[in-house]
């Protein structure tokens, strides 16, 4: 974990998906551990249940400049959830990028992105393209 922790502390871009969101969170609702603690949020592990609770959705994803000001919207982005977490509480330093079924499922804090869904298993690369420019 140390090379990743050094990368985060250096202010370099980081993108955590699913378990990556858990690792980046400052607080976990149902886990006493804190891993990197870089994202001002409380995350609930396995919030969507077991493998059979996996699902897909399509939502708009807001994007932000590193200073937190709005950058734009990625419209109609496919979301694939596999036993994913969700954000139980967003801290003042993080920005909500996306909600699905009434739950926050993507956050941005400066150059840190975290999603409860798996953008890497869809052919849509727009969120990765955004990550490359923050």
Question: What annotation goes with each model-predicted range?
Answer:
Residues 1-62:
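Cysteine-nucleophile active-site neighborhood
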């Amino acid at each position: 974990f140390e090379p990743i922790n050094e990368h985060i502390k250096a202010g370099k871009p980081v993108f955590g998906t699913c378990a990556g969101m858990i690792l980046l969170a400052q607080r976990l609702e149902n886990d006493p551990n804190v891993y990197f603690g870089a994202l001002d949020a409380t995350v609930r592990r396995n919030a969507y249940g077991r493998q059979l609770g996996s699902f897909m959705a399509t939502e708009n994803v807001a994007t932000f400049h590193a200073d937190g000001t709005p950058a734009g919207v990625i419209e109609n982005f496919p979301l694939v959830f596999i036993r994913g977490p969700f954000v139980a509480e967003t801290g003042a330093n993080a920005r909500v990028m996306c909600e699905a079924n009434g739950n926050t499922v993507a956050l941005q804090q400066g150059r840190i992105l975290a999603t409860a869904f798996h953008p890497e298993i869809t052919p849509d690369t727009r969120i990765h393209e955004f990550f490359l420019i923050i």
